[in-house]
Amino acid sequence: MNALSPLGMVSELPSSNQMQSDAERTVVHNSDAEVQKDYFVEKDGVKFAGMHLLVDLWGATNLCDPDHIDRALREAAEAAGATILHGHFHHFSPNGGVSGVLVLAESHISIHTWPERDFAAIDIFMCGACDPYDGIPALKAAFQPERIDLDEQRRGIVA
């Protein structure tokens, strides 16, 4: 049984567990030099792991096309100064929504769309020198929302 079946959602593709065996998955390890760097952020005298933006787009367009959504998130990541490592997007039926993620060297950007509600929920979590706010204009241009609700969370506050 598909994990989405109880929710009334049917996937066009098998789950990633069905598509890839453990032997086929790729694990990338960083070099020792990268491990030694401190990617925590300091802003207004507060040190933390990274900035997490929760972005709700209301009255948005272009929410059914995985290729368009992939390009939009890539443009947002690049504008924020992030390094894209990997992307994966999945198109659902019957409503046409898309869920996807870009794995970044600095964390991730993810999206879930509900085209039947003209709504998209986007998470942008970044550490280091990246500024997730710099990616917002690319998202506005790509999805042309009537309204944006934004919440900022500083993750992993240490001082």
Predicted regions: what they are:
Residues 1-159:
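Polybasic/polar functional segments that serve as interface/processing modules
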